[in-house]
Amino acid sequence: MILRYLIFFAQLWALCLANVNMFISKEEMNRTFGVKAELNYIEMGNVSSYSTKFHYRVMANIDYLSFTWNAVGIVHYEVYVESDDSSVLPIVRIPLKGTVPESLQDFTVEYRCAGHRSGQFAVSLYFTFKYGNKEPLKVKLRQEKICASRDGRRGLNGGYEGHEVDDTDSIDKAFFVIICIAAAFLLIVAATLICYFKRSKKEDMIPTRLPTSFRNSLKSTKSAQPFLLSTPRDGPPTLSAISSAPCSSSSASGNSIIPSKPRNIDVRRALLQLYQDRDAFQSLPLDMEGTFGEVRYAIWRQVDDVLNGDVDDEEDTFCNQEAVYTKTLKNNASPIQLDRFLSDALLFYNITPHQNLSQVACVASFGRFDRPETVTDFPLVCYRHQGFGNLKKFLTICRHGDKTKGAQTLRTHQLVSLATQVSSAVAHIHKYRIVHNDIAARNCLIAEVNGRLQVQLCDSALSRDLFPADYHCLGDNENRPLKWMSPEAIANELYSSAADVWSLGVLLWELMSLGGSPHAEIDPEEVYTMILKGKRLQQPNNCPDQLYEVMLCCWRVLSEDRPSSEQVVHGLRDFNIQLSQYI
């Protein structure tokens, strides 16, 4: 009898603690929307007002959407789906009634475009969750399915739920086609595996020190690539090693060093030009946050008057959706922090775009910047970005090898390519006489474009708040990235393109060390003294000698002895070409 009571109370307690979670995973968001961020609908029984208001766009080339859910305790559900137009047939691939699984599981909703009409069509997914004596939890999830006009689209009788085909010839033909496709697939898999193992074997053959023939070829073209000679060394670099690095003064002395000057941007005018209505943005969960600022992905819904669908709802006048990377301040930020935030964010404002430069795409507010009295929120600064987000965060994940967070195995040629790309961005801003003053992995974004990694140099807005451990104060009440700075910048605050090149060398080191912390063993107050004594960052594992020589060139004490950013680009490109011969 006592045992029965214990079981009863245990079940009652479980019902009282019951909760449900539902979300779209990072992998599914990346597959369907190109954004590697999780979209939470319900978390421990709490419904996200942000996410449930969001109309998830299911593009024409996407046939289904996967949701992930689980329950804590016993949770019963009911679900049904409806479409506002018969041109779309939504199908939920789970029973319409049942119990939410306790372990994380996926279920899918299929969206079938029927007929020949094109346009966007609203689909609503209704859930009711029941547990214990609590009020039922009702959730409505909205999707918008895009259907492209094409002849021969599968109709409503497209082989679902008992539709039978009696034509034996058709079955035979279908069977034959399936066999052919399977055979072709096996051949493709076999060929892919062979190519993969050959490529892996070839990359594994790349030594830390490239072959003598490669070094000789570099020596024979010394005038064309002055940075890429290989100098065998044991232990950390010394002053003599740095002085003898293959970037002679003759190659660097002709450089025109660009001093750092304020850009004097008219912030109000820039905000007016970049303004967008905040209601057009659907914020996703936090990606990073500090004390005063935060970073999120968001969906920018842009108005397009050309709409072929017949849905009359005002929401559906928004046709194009674009993923953006956003920065904004929290409510506890001060006006001084707002001024600094906007000044930093607009560093690249109004200069010619570059594929490796991340510039502000728009600034959103619920009010209007031409009527300041209507602006009660902090501006949402938006960058076009569909990728992994912050480079430093991405490199750290890759170094730790956490596949659940998107870790990748980065090969030498990929890292050299990223180094070349970010150097190209630095050379681009220097061409417009803009000095960055804070070049580092924390101020870059990384994505995958057409199967290749692409890095973009970004401004330093919010970096001091998001990465406080990278900034230190030397008694002047100014937090500075001392371990990325040149000696003249530390001692005399002399910022220039040459100081940027020093920081660029540290960024190359961050890439090759997969987000390592430079000079981690040195106190910030001692960095300047140690640099003058010849202390330099050690060569990372698997970093080719020629690339490390480029870093040493960037770290020469005298600013006039350093190469220009353009010379660094040329050197890295030449090295990349040579390296590709071994891949």
From Swiss-Prot:
Glycosylated residue positions: 30, 46
Compartmental location: Cell membrane; Basolateral cell membrane
Main location: membrane
Extracellular topological domain: 19-173
Sequence intervals crossing the membrane: 174-194
Pfam families found in the cross-reference section: PK_Tyr_Ser-Thr, WIF
GO BP term, example: positive regulation of motor neuron migration
Domain Protein kinase: 281-583
Residues exposed to the Cytoplasmic side: 195-583
Domain WIF, first and last residues per copy: 22-147
Assigned keywords, A-Z: ATP-binding, Cell membrane, Disulfide bond, Glycoprotein, Membrane, Neurogenesis, Nucleotide-binding, Receptor, Signal, Transmembrane, Transmembrane helix, Wnt signaling pathway
Binding-site residues for ATP, renumbered to this chain: 287-295, 327
Gene3D superfamilies reported for this sequence: Transferase(Phosphotransferase) domain 1, Wnt, WIF domain
GO molecular function, one term: ATP binding
Residue pairs linked by disulfide bridges in the UniProt entry: 113-147
Keyword Disulfide bond appears in the UniProt entry: yes
Signal peptide: 1-18
Membrane topology: Single-pass type I membrane protein
GO terms for cellular component: basolateral plasma membrane; cytoplasm; nucleus; plasma membrane; receptor complex
The family this protein is said to belong to: Belongs to the protein kinase superfamily. Tyr protein kinase family.
Role description: Has no detectable kinase activity in vitro and is unlikely to function as a tyrosine kinase in vivo. Receptor which may act as a receptor for Wnt ligand mom-2. Plays a role in controlling P7.p vulva precursor cell lineage orientation during vulva development. Regulates pop-1 asymmetric distribution in P7.p and its daughter cells. Plays a role in the migration of ALM neurons during embryogenesis.
Name assigned to this protein: Inactive tyrosine-protein kinase RYK
Organism: Caenorhabditis elegans
Lineage: Eukaryota, Metazoa, Ecdysozoa, Nematoda, Chromadorea
Designated gene of the protein: lin-18
